[in-house]
Amino acid sequence: ELLDGASAEFDQELVSKGELSPVFFGSALTNFGVETFLQHFLTMTMPPLPRTADCGVIDPVKEDFSAFVFKIQANMNKNHRDRIAFMRICSGKFEAGMEVKHIQGGKAIRLSQPQQLMAQERKIIEEAYAGDIIGVFDPGIFSIGDTLTTAKDNFEFEGIPTFAPE
């Protein structure tokens, strides 16, 4: 009763537009509501959306690999002074060791030892697809917003939105 009176009716279309946020109640400690959350989460998630570039819209089902760098993090491994560039795959299939064009750098680079990170755990991956986030070693050549692709024609993804501090 309390939930019925305190909330709006669920509308998947509003969730998809980002105008409504679903709220779930549960406890991972007691395993209350976890299964319900996971089942609903799977039905509510959307496939990767097309991303706008200077040449038009890049569809996630396009065969050519493309990605953009959205974060660079240094010193993630205390034993090494590493830098990891996090990128979101926008189209195509990523394969470990593949050669891509770094558009802003103007040259081809090989992306070896790609990683997926979850909290403090790192896992070397062999492949990833549109919508996935991967981390690659950054020898100092990447900047936030950089585009990487295997496409024949060069293009750059539109900039990442920035927000002024409040």
Task: Walk through the language-model features, giving the residues of each.
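Structural and coupling elements of P-loop NTPases
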Residues: 1-166
